[in-house]
Amino acid sequence: MTRTNKWTEREGKADPKYFSHTGNYGESPNHIKKQGSGKGNWGKPGDEIDDLIDNGEIPPVFKKDRRGSNLQSHEQKFENVQKE
């Protein structure tokens, strides 16, 4: 009888139970169901402020748009200097 490899040997160690038995396949083990929106998916704390801003009931205090770049004005300054 020839010697064969044991069928019980595994090539690598199995994942710990923390990773293999919690959550759905492909999710991180510390994944929060519904991204923390709560029971019934009512939303996260602070979501109502976005709704009020979108409806125009309050001014956009928390939703400041990013300030535009001054790149175009600088290009014009450099062009004027180089042309002279």
From Swiss-Prot:
Residues carrying Phosphoserine: S28, S69
Keyword tRNA processing in annotation: no
Functional summary from the UniProt entry: Found to stabilize, together with STF1, a complex of intrinsic ATPase inhibitor INH1 and proton-translocating ATPase (F(1)F(0)-ATPase) in mitochondrial membranes. Binds to the F0 part and may function to hold the ATPase inhibitor or STF1 on the F1 subunit. Also acts as a hydrophilins that enhances dry stress tolerance. Cell viability after desiccation and rehydration is due to the antioxidant capacity of the protein, which reduces the number of apoptotic cells during stress conditions by minimising the accumulation of reactive oxygen species (ROS) in the cells.
Highest taxon above the source species: Eukaryota
Gene Ontology cellular component terms for the protein in this record: cytoplasm; mitochondrion
Coiled-coil stretches noted in the UniProt entry, renumbered to this chain: none
Cytoplasm among keywords: yes
Extent of Basic and acidic residues compositional bias: 1-18, 74-84
Species lineage: Eukaryota, Fungi, Dikarya, Ascomycota, Saccharomycotina
Family, similarity comment: Belongs to the STF2 family.
Keywords: Cytoplasm, Mitochondrion, Phosphoprotein
Cellular compartment(s): Mitochondrion; Cytoplasm
Region listing for Disordered, in residue ranges: 1-84
Protein name as annotated: ATPase-stabilizing factor 15 kDa protein
GO biological process, one term: cellular response to desiccation
Additional comment: Present with 5330 molecules/cell in log phase SD medium.
Gene field: STF2
